[in-house]
């Protein structure tokens, strides 16, 4: 997607001055605060920039690198704000309140999901899920981890399982710069005044994602979880920039920002690396670096994908991009170009990137003929075949008319050699009313649901 309207969601816990409080920073380069944690908590180093008080029996002082560093080195805390991709304006509902996340060796604020099933994997040009290698279909519901009502989450997974949709993409980020009102879900707070970040692992934080992962395990659905948004919705790059300086184009190479970003990745991956519900980790939602050399995103993606694999070698990793910068079949139009800093084929060749992703929004890209999308899908399938990796048709949609040209894109995806498709986006009635929606939403049980989902699933099952 392009940029969505967003509602920042926050709430933070303050730290004491004499001792660092629960989840507070207690060490790191250029950190001048207390390195002693409150009783029952210990100081654990997450990276050279940031050590955090996590549950533990004793207080310890972290080791700090003596390498010279800038005087404005970051301190990390995590908050929430929303972000997605396309030019879609959507209403966003709130979630809950919480605390930062401990490392995988520390006690977790809520039980980690441990369900049955096996890890999804790439199998040639296809995906294998729970031992079955075939074409799969799924959807996007970015808003699901921000729901506070467990029954709403269960209902969504009930409907997905009934429909046979095996893959669901949800936001694994929600970055904020200001604490939201109580009862609003956020995952990471980037304090602009203190240049610190805090991870929220409380009931209105990552514990909501915990429930989503557990529900996915129960229903046999696999999740794709991106770590940051290119767009300002739900925080995005700008939430980091507001706290640490620089610009969106500098986000990829800013040492302080990347340290905070990697600390968040470690917190989330460590939480779910043993879960069979994770289909793949994504570096971000629609990464873009406008006007940059394609080397910027390529270098960043090479480094971060390797880092994720070092934390979790069992799950797949993808970039989460739109598929821009493709030479195969190029008509020199905007999406085929590299103005947004992406080179699809170069990025796909990164060793730790397991599959390619492509998105499709003709209206948002200034394409007047929807039939253009068929070639877009086919050309990416050719690029993936050349690379020997699967292609995921990860986001696609139209503003209305979901039962016309959109169905042709689905048929092209089935016949061209892509491995799966995820329609944008799923909607249904929740306890609070309609789920967050945009012009692309397809609501459960409607006529559009039948044509765009149920009829498509019949074709998928015949494939």
UniProtKB/Swiss-Prot annotation:
A Pfam family this chain is assigned to = Cellulase
Q: From what superkingdom does this record's organism come? A: Eukaryota
Compositionally biased region (Low complexity): 59-77, 93-118
> Got a GO cellular component term for this one?
extracellular region
Location comes to: Secreted
SUPFAM superfamilies according to UniProt: (Trans)glycosidases (SSF51445), Cellulose-binding domain (SSF57180)
Q: Which parts pass through the membrane?
A: none
Q: Which residue ranges are recorded for the region named Ser-rich linker?
A: 75-118
What glycosylation sites does the entry record? 87
Active site located where? 286 (proton donor), 395 (nucleophile)
> What is the UniProt domain comment for this protein?
Has a modular structure: a carbohydrate-binding module (CBM) at the N-terminus, a linker rich in serines, and a C-terminal endo-1,4-mannanase catalytic module. The genes for catalytic modules and CBMs seem to have evolved separately and have been linked by gene fusion.
The family line of this record is: Belongs to the glycosyl hydrolase 5 (cellulase A) family.
Q: Function, please?
A: Endo-1,4-mannanase, a crucial enzyme for depolymerization of seed galactomannans and wood galactoglucomannans.
Q: By what name is this protein known? A: Probable mannan endo-1,4-beta-mannosidase F
Q: Which organism is it from?
A: Aspergillus flavus (strain ATCC 200026 / FGSC A1120 / IAM 13836 / NRRL 3357 / JCM 12722 / SRRC 167)
């Amino acid at each position: 997607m392009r940029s969505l309207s967003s509602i920042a969601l926050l709430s933070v816990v303050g730290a004491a001055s004499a001792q660092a409080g629960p989840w507070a920073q207690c060490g790191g380069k250029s950190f001048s605060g207390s390195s002693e944690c409150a009783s029952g908590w210990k100081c654990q180093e997450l990276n050279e920039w940031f050590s955090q008080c996590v549950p533990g029996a004793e207080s310890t002082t972290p080791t700090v690198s003596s390498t010279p560093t800038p005087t404005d080195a970051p301190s990390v805390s995590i908050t929430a704000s929303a972000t997605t991709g396309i030019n879609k304006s959507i209403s966003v509902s709130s979630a809950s309140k919480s605390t930062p996340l401990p490392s995988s060796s520390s006690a977790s604020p809520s039980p980690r999901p441990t369900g049955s099933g096996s890890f999804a994997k790439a199998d040639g040009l296809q995906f294998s899920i729970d031992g079955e290698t075939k074409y799969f279909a799924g959807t996007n519901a970015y808003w699901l981890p921000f729901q506070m009502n467990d029954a709403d989450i269960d209902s969504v997974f009930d409907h997905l399982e009934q429909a046979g949709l095996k893959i669901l993409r949800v936001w694994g980020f929600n970055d904020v710069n200001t604490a939201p009102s109580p009862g609003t879900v956020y995952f990471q707070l980037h304090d602009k005044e203190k240049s610190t970040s805090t991870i929220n692992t409380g009931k209105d934080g990552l514990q909501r994602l915990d429930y989503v992962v557990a529900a996915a395990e129960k229903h046999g659905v696999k999740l794709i979880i991106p770590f940051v948004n290119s767009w300002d919705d739900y925080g995005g790059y700008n939430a980091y920039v507001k706290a640490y300086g620089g610009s969106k184009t500098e986000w990829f190479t800013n040492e302080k920002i990347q340290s905070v970003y990697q600390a968040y990745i470690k917190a989330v991956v460590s939480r779910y690396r043993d879960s069979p519900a994770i289909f793949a980790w994504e570096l971000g939602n629609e990464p873009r670096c406008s006007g940059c050399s394609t080397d910027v995103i390529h270098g960043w993606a090479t480094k971060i994908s390797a880092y994720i694999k070092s934390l979790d070698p069992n799950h797949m990793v993808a970039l989460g991009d739109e598929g821009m910068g493709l030479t195969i079949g190029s008509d020199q139009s905007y999406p085929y170009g590299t103005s947004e800093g992406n080179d699809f084929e170069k990025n796909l060749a990164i060793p730790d990137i397991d599959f390619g992703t492509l998105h499709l929004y003709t209206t948002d890209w200034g394409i007047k003929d929807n039939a253009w999308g068929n070639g877009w899908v086919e050309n990416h399938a050719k690029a993936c075949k050349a690379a020997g990796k699967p292609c995921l048709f990860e986001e696609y949609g139209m503003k209305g008319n979901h039962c016309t040209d959109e169905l042709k894109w689905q048929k092209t995806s089935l016949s061209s050699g892509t491995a799966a498709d995820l329609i944008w986006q799923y909607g249904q009635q929740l306890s609070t009313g309609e789920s967050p929606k945009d012009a692309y939403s397809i609501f459960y049980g409607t006529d559009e649901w039948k044509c765009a989902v149920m009829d498509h699933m019949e074709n998928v099952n015949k494939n």
